[in-house]
């Protein structure tokens, strides 16, 4: 085997022998504060299950538990050409998915940048721009036209209420969008109208959430998939429940969606424990919540998602500075800026391979104008490990809760998102947490009964597969939503 270029030296823990007693005391205090024991995780899981159940009840609860109207499992044998449309914050992605029928698929995709003025323009400007992109894509890949309209799955990652899979009423814009005349309206007919104006052979048959897409896409290729999760700027999970277990749908469903029918549920569980009953919040978590745009909401997300990990670190470092332990006689004005430390900070610090943590030294010098001593860097490294590990241990409580609720003893959990994919050692931290919850006597993480595995593309492939399943139901005259819709 030929290795190209220098091999990165292995990460070294480094000795704590040179750390003075007063700083060691602070490190031990932080360990106590941020360590989540196996026992604590089990109590969180128990409460999580009751909150998931509450979300499915008629009364509802903190966790929305939104029915995704995917009422069939993909078999992996589905075939055909399907389109997916993914409307993100800055780009529009169009994906052609050719399902091979043997748990396999091919994809072709184009990305289109959304012009800034569209974010605050008119409803017609937005939908006609999207329709033009679709036309360009179809003309390029089907120059001879198509024999019948292409079914399209639309990944719409904005809060929308759905009574059936081929409709979705926008509740409110997020991600910097503020387009009049869309909130409170069904987005599917708005898009379909512009598609028809340009005579494009496309039918929008499904509106989906990206987490539900992650679940379905991964199940198509891997029959052991039991859940789709996103661990990135936000956190979320989706799984299949059975209709008989969803109390809030009682009496609302047509006969062809029976009590034994599966139903994909988009949990939106970032709002777990908004009452602060079980999550081990520190004073730093309280500050983050109180100074956030929506205090008292998204409690679980604020302790686990990539958006907040750097900020938790920053608040701890500020506290240590104010108490006179670190960065003595230095200008820390940059460190005082809220959210100046994003997740790349703990990520780079945990990835620093050098004994004296040179990369961390550069990071603080270049970005924050702070000179650090080796001893300070050892504390910073320990803090990054504690914050990252706590996030992983809390995150898998959601996974464990769904597995226990559904009685899964073995499962592949299809995971996606920037933290899962890029944060160093995250997969190992999560695997260790699951091992601790269940007390498994298994050494290797690849032998664990429940494993986090890399997901398939949910917003592209997942949306296309859901379009395929929905198209089949519609063609057979079956329902795709509540009675009378």
Swiss-Prot record:
Homology family: Belongs to the hexokinase family.
GO cellular component: cytosol; mitochondrion
Keywords: Allosteric enzyme, ATP-binding, Glycolysis, Kinase, Nucleotide-binding, Phosphoprotein, Transferase
Every Hexokinase domain range: 21-468
One GO BP: glycolytic process
Membrane among keywords: no
EC code: 2.7.1.1
Entry protein name: Hexokinase
Assembly with partners or alone: Monomer and homodimer. The monomeric form is active, the homodimeric form inactive.
Domain of life assignment: Eukaryota
Classification via Pfam families: Hexokinase_1, Hexokinase_2
Function, in words: Catalyzes the phosphorylation of hexose, such as D-glucose and D-fructose, to hexose 6-phosphate (D-glucose 6-phosphate and D-fructose 6-phosphate, respectively). Has higher affinity for D-glucose. Mediates the initial step of glycolysis by catalyzing phosphorylation of D-glucose to D-glucose 6-phosphate.
Organism of origin: Kluyveromyces lactis (strain ATCC 8585 / CBS 2359 / DSM 70799 / NBRC 1267 / NRRL Y-1140 / WM37)
Catalytic activity: a D-hexose + ATP = a D-hexose 6-phosphate + ADP + H(+); D-fructose + ATP = D-fructose 6-phosphate + ADP + H(+); D-glucose + ATP = D-glucose 6-phosphate + ADP + H(+)
């Amino acid at each position: 085997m030929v290795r190209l270029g220098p091999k990165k030296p292995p990460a070294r823990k480094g000795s704590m022998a040179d750390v003075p007693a007063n700083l060691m005391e602070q490190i031990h205090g932080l360990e106590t504060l941020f360590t989540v024991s196996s026992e604590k995780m089990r109590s969180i899981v128990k409460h999580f299950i009751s909150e998931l159940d509450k979300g499915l009840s008629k009364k509802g609860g903190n966790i929305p538990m939104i029915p995704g109207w995917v009422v069939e499992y993909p078999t992996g044998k589905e075939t055909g050409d399907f389109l997916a449309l993914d409307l993100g914050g800055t780009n529009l992605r169009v994906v052609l998915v050719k399902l091979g029928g043997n748990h396999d698929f091919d994809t072709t995709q184009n990305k289109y940048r959304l012009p800034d003025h569209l974010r605050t323009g008119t409803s017609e400007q937005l939908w006609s721009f999207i329709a033009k992109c679709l036309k360009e894509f179809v003309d390029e890949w089907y120059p001879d036209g198509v024999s019948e309209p292409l079914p399209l799955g639309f990944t719409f990652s904005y809060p929308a209420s759905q009574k059936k899979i081929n409709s979705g009423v926008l509740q409110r814009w997020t991600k910097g969008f503020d387009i009049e005349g869309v909130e409170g309206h069904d987005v599917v007919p708005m898009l379909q109208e512009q598609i028809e104006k340009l005579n494009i052979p496309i039918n929008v048959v499904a509106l989906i959430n990206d987490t539900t897409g992650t679940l379905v896409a991964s199940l198509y290729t891997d029959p052991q998939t039991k859940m789709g999760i996103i661990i990135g700027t936000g956190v979320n999970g989706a799984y299949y429940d059975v209709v008989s277990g969803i109390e809030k749908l009682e009496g609302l469903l047509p006969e062809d969606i029976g009590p034994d029918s599966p139903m994909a549920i988009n949990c939106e569980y970032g709002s777990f424990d908004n009452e602060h009953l079980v999550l081990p919040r520190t004073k730093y978590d309280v500050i983050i919540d109180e100074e956030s745009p929506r205090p008292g909401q998204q409690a679980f997300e604020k302790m686990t998602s990539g958006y907040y990990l750097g900020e938790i670190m920053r608040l701890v470092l500020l506290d240590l500075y104010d108490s006179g332990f670190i960065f003595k006689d230095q200008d820390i004005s940059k460190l005082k800026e809220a959210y100046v430390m994003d997740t790349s900070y703990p990520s780079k610090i945990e990835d620093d391979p050098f004994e004296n943590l040179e990369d961390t030294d550069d990071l603080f010098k270049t970005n924050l104008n702070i000179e650090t001593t080796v001893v300070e860097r050892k504390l910073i490294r320990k803090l990054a490990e504690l914050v990252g590990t706590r996030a992983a241990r809390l995150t898998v409580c959601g996974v464990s809760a769904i597995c226990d609720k559904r009685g899964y003893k073995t499962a592949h959990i299809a995971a996606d998102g920037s933290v899962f994919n890029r944060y160093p050692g995250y997969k190992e931290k999560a695997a260790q947490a699951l091992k601790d919850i269940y007390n498994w006597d298994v050494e290797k993480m690849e032998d664990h009964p429940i494993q986090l595995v890399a997901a398939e593309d949910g917003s592209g492939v997942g949306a296309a597969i859901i379009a395929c399943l929905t198209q089949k139901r519609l063609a057979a005259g079956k329902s795709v939503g509540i009675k009378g819709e």
